């Protein structure tokens, strides 16, 4: 749901550093910033589709306190996604599961390397004018708010997780939507533990 004020922080203002305040940025999922990549997507086979990608990795091991500080990666970030769509009882179902992995090091050998890995999953169901979507993620060593680790926080192998629930009903030219998202983090994104939640309701007329 792209309306609403979005998630805010007492110290940072908007979690995305003062950018747009779309409804659930910062809660429920790491915002997927564009990145250089080579991705293969298979044809849809009986509703099943597989994607595999090699991505430009991001710095996660910056340590400004070290004179030798320089984050680097030996290999790209790997991502994959499996989607499956089908119909049952008159409802259209779209489901997905995805994952990522990357490792970041530092030229200062005293700075621990970070092995980042995560998994995401979700399902969407549509029937008549109703639409319901539920998704979530669990990860270790990632920035739980934005995939490019904006601000280059020094990350650690600590956990984060979140979920996003959205539902809507369309009748005529009208649509009513509800949304609720939550992200919990042990301290990677902001340096201290975070527990953010956003709820929203919207009315659209086209």
Regions found by a protein language model. Name each.
Residues 65-69, 192:
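Solvent-exposed, low-complexity segments and loops of surface/extracellular structural proteins
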């Amino acid at each position: 749901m792209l309306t609403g004020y979005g998630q805010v922080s007492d110290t940072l203002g908007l979690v995305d550093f003062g950018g747009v305040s779309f409804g659930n940025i910062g809660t429920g999922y790491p915002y997927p910033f564009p990145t250089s990549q080579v991705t293969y997507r298979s044809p849809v086979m009986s509703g099943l589709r597989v994607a595999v990608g090699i991505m430009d990795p991001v710095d996660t091991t910056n340590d400004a306190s070290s004179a030798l500080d320089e984050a680097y990666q030996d290999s790209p970030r790997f991502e994959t996604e499996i989607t499956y769509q089908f119909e049952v009882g008159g409802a259209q179902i779209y489901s997905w599961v995805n994952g990522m992995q990357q490792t970041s090091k530092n030229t200062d050998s005293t700075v621990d390397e970070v092995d980042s890995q995560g998994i995401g999953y979700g399902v969407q169901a549509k029937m008549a004018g109703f639409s319901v979507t539920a998704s979530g993620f669990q990860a270790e060593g990632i920035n739980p708010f934005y995939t490019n680790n904006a601000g280059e926080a020094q990350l650690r192998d600590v956990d984060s997780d979140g979920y996003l629930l959205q539902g809507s009903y369309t009748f005529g030219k009208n649509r009513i939507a509800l949304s609720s998202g939550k992200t919990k983090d042990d301290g990677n994104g902001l340096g201290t533990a975070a527990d953010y939640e956003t709820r929203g309701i919207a009315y659209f007329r086209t």
